[in-house]
C-alpha cells in the first residue's frame, strides 16, 4: 500500500512539474502572443458573426497559428494583417514588443485614439498602413527610428500637429499623409524632397516651396532713330525667314502626327532628373540603351496600350518598358504626370509596382520591374519546351493573389481604379509564382481627356462584360466578369476566344463552351490536359462555381472582388452558390447536387506554410 501511495505521489509530482514547465514555456515563448492579445482585447468587431480575431487564442504557446498573423521559421511574428476587418477600438503600446514585425496593416477600419510612441521600437518594420481610420493626435516622432520603413500610409484620419522632422531621415519610398488635420511646414530635406503635394493634400500645411522666379532683364530704353531703322530691317528679314519656315513647320507637324516606330531625342528630354514621389523620371536615352534601341528581339508583348520591351538598366536591374500609344491633348503632360503618380500610389503585393516613367513631347513610356515567369497566359499556352506546366496548387494561389490585387484597386485606393481588361495575359508571375496584376490604371491614363465614366470600350474579346460592351460604361463589376473568365483560363488552359474550337463544333467563347460542357456533366473534359490528372476534383468544382458567379450576365448579381476574396478564403461560397442555383437553375444547368463537395477551405489551408507566403498589402 505504501508503495502504491509513493507511486501516486511520484506521478502527481511529475504532472505538477510538467504543468509548471509548460506554463513557463508558454510565458517565455508567448511575449508576442501577449502583445497581440492586448490588441485583441482593445479591439472589437463590427461583424461578430465574422470576427477576424476569433482564432486569437491566448492559451496557445505561439500566435503563429492565428489567422491574419504571419511568422518566420523561428516562430517570430513578422506580419499582422487586419485591413478592412470592420474593427473598432484603439492601438496598444504593447505592439512595440513585436520586434520582428515587418508589416502592420490596419487600413480601412474604425480605429480611434493615438498612434503609440512604442511603434518606434519596431526596428524591422517595412510597412505601416493605417489608412482610412479615425486615428487622432500627432504623428509620433519615434517613427523616425524605423530605419527599414519604406511604406507609410496615414492618410484619411484625423491626425493633428506638425510632421516630425525625424521622419526625414527615413528612406521612405511611399508616403501618404493626406486628408488629415496636420499643420506647420512640410519638410523638404531627406526623402521628403522626393514627394509632391499629392502626398500632403487636404491638410493645413505650408505649401511646398516654389522654385525661384526666373530673373528678368530691366526694361530697355526707347530705341533711337538708328535703332529703329535696324529694327525695321530686322523685322523684314524675320518675315522673310518666317515665309520659308512655315512649310518646314507644317511638314514637321505632319511627321509628328504620323504613328512612328522611331524614337528621337530632343533637348527637353535632357532636363534635370525629376521625381514624382518614389518614381524616377528616366531619360529616353537611358531606355534606348536599356532596350538596345527598342529592338524587336526585346519585345515581351503587344497589347491595346502599346508594346512592352525587356530592358537592362545601367545598374544591372531588369525592367519591362511599356511604350504607350495615345492621342495627346493640350495640357495632357500635367494630367499624365498626375495619373502616373496616382497609379504609383497603388502598392500591394499582388499589384505590379510602377518604377518610373519617361515623358517627352513625342513619347510616353512606363517602366516596371521585370517579371521572371512572364504572364499566366504565357505559362498556360506558350511555355518553352522543357519548362514544367503550372501545377494545380500554383493555379489556386494565382486565383487568390489576383483576386486580392483587384480587390485592393477597387476598395483601398484613394481613387478607385477599374482595370477594364482583366485576363490571364495581364496577370504576371514573379520569381515565386506570386500573381501580380499588371496594366491597371492604364485605361484611365489613356483617356485622360475624358472626364466621364463612359469611354471607348477597352478590353479583349471573350473577357468583356456584356454591359460594358453594350453601353461603354465600366464599373468594378466589369473587372469581376473578366476575373471570372480568367479563372476558366486557369482551369482549362484555353483562350477566352478561340476560333479553333469551331473545328469541333464548340463555342468559340470559353465561357459558353464551359457552360455547355457542364450541362453534359463532363467535368473532367474541362480541366487542362497539362495537369495530367494531378488535381483535386472538389477544388476544380469550387473554382468553377466561383467563375460562374463572377460571370453572371447581370452586373448587380456578381459579387464584389472583396467578396470573392472572402469566398476563396473559405467564407460563404457554398451559401452563395446554393442561392444562385435556386435563381438560375433554368438557365445554367450545372447541378450542385451532382457535385456534392461543399467545403471551401481548400483555398486557404489553415497551415503555416501558406500563411507565411501571404503578403496581402506590402510594397513589392
Swiss-Prot record:
GO molecular function, one example? transmembrane receptor protein serine/threonine kinase activity
List where the protein spans the membrane.
235-255
What residue stretch is flagged as signal peptide? 1-33
- SMART domains, alphabetically? S_TKc
Q: What ranges does the Extracellular topological domain annotation cover? A: 34-234
Disruption-associated phenotype: No visible phenotype; due to the redundancy with BAK1. Compromised SCOOP10- and SCOOP12-induced root growth inhibition and reactive oxygen species (ROS) production in the double mutant bak1-5 serk4. Bak1 and bkk1 double mutants are seedling lethal.
Placement of LRR repeats on the sequence: 100-122, 124-146, 148-170, 171-193, 194-215
One GO BP annotation here? cell death
Q: Where is this region: Disordered?
A: 205-227
Pro residues bias spans: 209-224
Residue ranges annotated for the Protein kinase domain, each copy included: 294-591
Q: Which principal EC class is assigned to this enzyme? A: transferase
Query: What domain of life is recorded for the organism?
Result: Eukaryota
Q: How is it modified after translation?
A: Autophosphorylated on Thr and Tyr residues.
Q: Where is the active site?
A: 421 (proton acceptor)
Record's keyword terms, sorted = ATP-binding, Cell membrane, Glycoprotein, Kinase, Leucine-rich repeat, Membrane, Nucleotide-binding, Phosphoprotein, Receptor, Repeat, Serine/threonine-protein kinase, Signal, Transferase, Transmembrane, Transmembrane helix, Tyrosine-protein kinase
* Topology of this chain in the membrane: Single-pass type I membrane protein
Catalyzed reaction equations: L-seryl-[protein] + ATP = O-phospho-L-seryl-[protein] + ADP + H(+); L-threonyl-[protein] + ATP = O-phospho-L-threonyl-[protein] + ADP + H(+); L-tyrosyl-[protein] + ATP = O-phospho-L-tyrosyl-[protein] + ADP + H(+)
Please tell me where ATP binds in this chain: 300-308, 322
Glycan attachment positions: 110, 156, 189, 202
Localization recorded for this chain is: Cell membrane
EC numbers on record: 2.7.10.1, 2.7.11.1
- Which family, according to UniProt? Belongs to the protein kinase superfamily. Ser/Thr protein kinase family.
* PANTHER family in alphabetical order: SOMATIC EMBRYOGENESIS RECEPTOR KINASE 1
Instruction: Return the protein name.
Output: Somatic embryogenesis receptor kinase 4
Q: Which organism is it from?
A: Arabidopsis thaliana
